[in-house]
Amino acid sequence: VLNFGHTFGHAFESLALEKGCPMPHGVCIAHGIVSALVLSHLRLDCPSELLHRIAKEIVAPYYKTPAFTCDDYPRLLELMRSDKKNAIAGQILFVLLRNKAIPEIDVPADDREIAAALDITRDLLGS
């Protein structure tokens, strides 16, 4: 459960470093939590109210939005695949939430689902 948001967050952090605009680890993880909540909603029907509250009331007002576009998705996916937590070759695994305090661990998601989560994250956070 400790890794909630980290698969996305570490990819955001690595991409920011590659682009020459490093962002603090905590900021990247905060945005990763929003992406993980989006994916939780898409995959596990986590309540949208929880997602919107975290995104709009907690993350967006206080953290600079990571600058990524859909052109960055292939690189973000590559970074996620190389994450040390993804032990199953080729699969990207996530800690997701069914609801507040009800986690699911090692939930696989395909590229299409991850891209959809990234699109929605960008919409929610104004990227």
Task: Please tell me what each predicted stretch does.
Residues V1-P74:
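Active-site segments that bind and position negatively charged phosphate/pyrophosphate groups
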Residues D45-S127:
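C-terminal charged capping/lid subdomain of soluble metabolic enzymes
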